[in-house]
Amino acid sequence: HVAAYLSEERDAAIQLHDGGDVIVASDPLDGSSNIDTNVSIGTIFSILPASGGSLQPGRNQLASGIFVYGPQTTLLVTCGDGVFAFQLGTDGQFHDMGWQVRMPAETSEFAINASNSRHWAAPVSRYIADCLAGSAGPRQRNFNMRWVGSLVADGWRIFRRGGIFLYPADARDGYDNGRLRLVYEA
């Protein structure tokens, strides 16, 4: 039984079952600001033991994952030993896509909202500048920058092809710890 449900869309937890075993935390519609542009959106979730309360370290997660609602409805999920991919079939069931996520040792993609670059700390700016310098820069190879503005869409691509997703802290009010909400999105 689910003891409580935490949503990025609500100010307080919804208590469901006294003595429940787990807490479910989610961002139920990540990327919703992009609906009118037809960009993939999705759901981010985390399942935690109820005994630890709602604010506990991510290492305590029992399972976590993302659903992506786009040209395909897909699910990436982990229960702590690997990340697995599933696709919603025409029968209404999720089917194993036949691959376990393995991040490549090297990649040439990164996702960051470059429109915020004027607010970044110097180390972040240097890292991105090094990537953008391509083969002529200190990393001596070309990189591709991607940014959809939907964590689930950017995350799916990173998990599928490798890379890094960055939403760093910056100098704007309210962004001193980055933008991802730890309980719901990290």
Question: Predicted segment positions?
Answer:
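An extended, acidic
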Residues: 65-186
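Short, flexible, glycine/charge-rich loop motifs used to bind or transfer phosphoryl groups or to couple energy/partner
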Residues: 12-15, 54-55, 155
